[in-house]
Regions:
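Alpha-helical transmembrane segments and immediately membrane-proximal extracytoplasmic
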Residues: 1-411
Length: 411
């Protein structure tokens, strides 16, 4: 009798245990399904963000190359000035939308800050980022896309009554989906979450981020089936192993030194310029004057400088002096743009700086007879990755992102 009683207890406990396991599996399955939904929504928001940036860049380039009368330039200048003042006022009211957004996303994921008004801040980040870059500032799209994704992940977790312990995983999934939507790169989006936001490789976080990234990347690939980076010819220098080792060691050391200087001077400007006792209209006037002057001379260098880099990669100049001047102008412009606190990331400007450094280094090697002109674009691509790794310190993300953007695996 006692044996039968113990058997019944064991059976009940076993059934309860199985049900608990199945319940956990159902919860995980629900989380994965919701992460797919987060990726879809992030793609539907971040991809139009990307499209609007390209659209306004084309509008701005058409205007500056059409040689309109001077009074049209005066009118446009005052319109852009008003836009920058409006965006700066948004940042003053909602400080979390300032800058790129990756530090804020990391802080929200780690519980150091809380998104109190995620929907309002999402709209403000979207509009502020588009308007700031439409004025030509040297900012990127990846940081805002990451933060937009984190806002969407937060909103879905609240609206969907997701368990409190799983909300940060949806926030991280949304952040990864944002990067995937910005560059159509789902693998690098997962790596970014692990290397920069989450900083540990929890399997559930990796799975949710990858699912959201694949869906968001699919939306981006549907909207932008090709990327301009695959048009850059990457011809590997035909050097011996020893000579290649010497070449890349020298290049790596040079990039590390410049990246260290870059990493020190950017925070210095970001601290000093906001501390200047100037009103917002005056600060925006100075910033817009620089942006407008560059737009009048070299429009491709504005808006982050990605178009200028593409032009150099496909049909670049051989004039080292001119290219060095353009790189320094872009660098100084980026410092002032990042120090403004307006919505926009540093990813694209950093890539452009690294790419131009790689091109200059390649042209120097051509003059010394180490490589040919056909290898300069390859050095540009290597420079982009090397400088990004040295500045951001996310090596896997940088390498995989470059490969995904060029749609090749051999790199």
């Amino acid at each position: 009798m006692k044996l039968e009683k113990w058997k019944n207890k064991w059976k009940k406990w076993s059934n309860l245990r199985k049900w608990q396991i199945w319940k956990l599996k159902l919860i995980d399955a629900r989380l994965y399904f919701v992460s797919i939904f987060v990726g879809l929504l992030t793609g539907l928001v971040a991809v139009p963000y990307h499209y609007l940036l390209w659209y306004f860049f084309d509008v701005r380039k058409t205007f500056f190359t059409a040689h309109y009368p001077w009074y049209w330039h005066v009118l446009l200048f005052f319109i852009l000035w008003g836009i920058l003042i409006f965006v700066a006022s948004l940042v003053k009211r909602m400080p979390l939308i300032a800058g790129g957004g990756i530090p804020q996303t990391r802080a929200a994921n780690n519980g150091r800050i809380r998104y109190e008004h995620p929907f309002k801040e999402l709209v403000a980040k979207f509009c502020g980022g588009v308007l700031a870059l439409s004025a030509g500032l040297s900012l990127g799209r990846e940081g805002p896309s990451v933060q937009i994704g984190s806002y969407i992940g937060t909103l879905i977790s609240r609206w969907g009554h997701i368990l409190k312990g799983e909300r940060k995983q949806l926030l991280a999934a949304g952040a990864g989906a944002g990067l995937s939507a910005a560059f159509a790169a789902p693998l690098s989006s997962s790596l970014l979450v692990i290397e920069s936001i989450e900083r540990f490789d929890a399997p559930k976080t990796a799975i949710t981020t990858l699912l959201a990234g694949v869906v968001a990347g699919g939306v981006a690939s549907w909207m932008f089936p090709t990327t301009p980076y695959h048009l850059i010819s990457a011809v590997v220098p035909g050097l011996s192993f020893i000579r290649q080792a010497e070449l890349y060691i020298i290049f790596a050391a040079l990039m590390a030194v410049i990246a260290k200087f870059y990493s020190l001077i950017v925070p210095f400007f970001q601290e000093r310029i906001p501390a200047m006792k100037l009103s917002i209209p005056v600060k925006m006037l100075y910033l817009l004057t620089i942006a407008y002057a560059i737009s009048l001379t070299e429009t491709n260098l504005t808006g982050g400088g990605e178009q200028f880099l593409m032009m150099q990669g496909m049909n670049g100049t051989h004039d080292i002096q001119w290219l060095t001047i353009m790189m320094l102008i872009h660098f100084v412009f980026t410092l002032f743009s990042l120090s403004s606190g307006l919505p926009g990331g540093s990813f694209i400007p950093t890539l452009v700086t690294g790419g131009l450094l790689g091109q200059i280094f390649g042209l120097v090697l051509v003059q010394r007879g180490w490589i040919g002109y056909e290898n300069v674009s390859y050095m540009m691509l290597i420079g982009m990755v090397a400088f990004l790794v040295a500045v951001v310190r996310t090596p896997l993300t940088a390498i995989v992102l470059r490969s995904e953007e060029r749609r090749v695996g051999k790199e």
